[in-house]
Amino acid sequence: KYLLTRSKCDFCQKPISYLQLVPIFNFIRSQGKSLCCNRQLSKSYIIGELLSYVSLIILNITTLPVNGAVLLLIYFSLLVLALYDIKTFSIPIHIPIIVIITSFILGSFYLLQGCFITMLLHLIFYCCKNCIGYGDILIFALLSFILPFSIFFLILWFTFLTGGCFSIFYIALKRSLKLKLPLVPFIFCAFIMVALFYPFLTWVVI
């Protein structure tokens, strides 16, 4: 029943026509507003639609030793979670559950590695609760189960490298230490960087 449910307007709950579901085209045609009640739509829609096409580039040029279906699964899951994290500073738990089950079915599953890294991540979380959110711990744990260690390590490394650089720049610009950042967008960016430049990054884990 859930899969057959029609998409509805965020505001008036009126069912959306199939033409309105065409990515990018409808957002431009409607000037970023809902056609049924003329209210401004979230910019996350157009951002998500534009970024979804990056997956085609990655799929065609990446040299990651990862199944194409798993690669797309991770990409779109992180994209959705990143946009959700920016808006709410939280993640919907059902998405990681769906991803890990699907990855297991697709044959991309590293049980012992995932268990060890997950325990280590939880230890870090309990020692540094104010430094990282539990949702971020869950995302890293998820990736440790479905990606080879070298790729997981690179994503982890680039996440904190880009997140740290952004934090320093933001603090210097705003002259304030009061900073709360959603981390999943940096995980998403790190995944893209690793997927695109993997052949040039292997020296990091050698």
Task: Please tell me what each predicted stretch does.
Residues 34-102:
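Long, charge-rich boundary regions
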Residues 39, 153-157, 185:
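Internal alpha-helical transmembrane segments of multi-pass membrane proteins, especially GPCRs
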Residues 73-171, 205-206:
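Functional transmembrane core segments of multi-pass inner-membrane proteins
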Residues 62, 169-173, 200-201:
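Juxtamembrane "helix-exit" motif on the non-cytosolic side of transmembrane helices
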Residues 196-206:
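Juxtamembrane boundary at the C-terminal end of a transmembrane helix
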Residues 1-44:
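Membrane-proximal soluble regions of multi-pass membrane proteins
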Residues 168-193:
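Interfacial loop-to-transmembrane junctions
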Residues 52-56, 117, 121, 162-166, ...:
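Alpha-helical transmembrane segments of multipass membrane proteins
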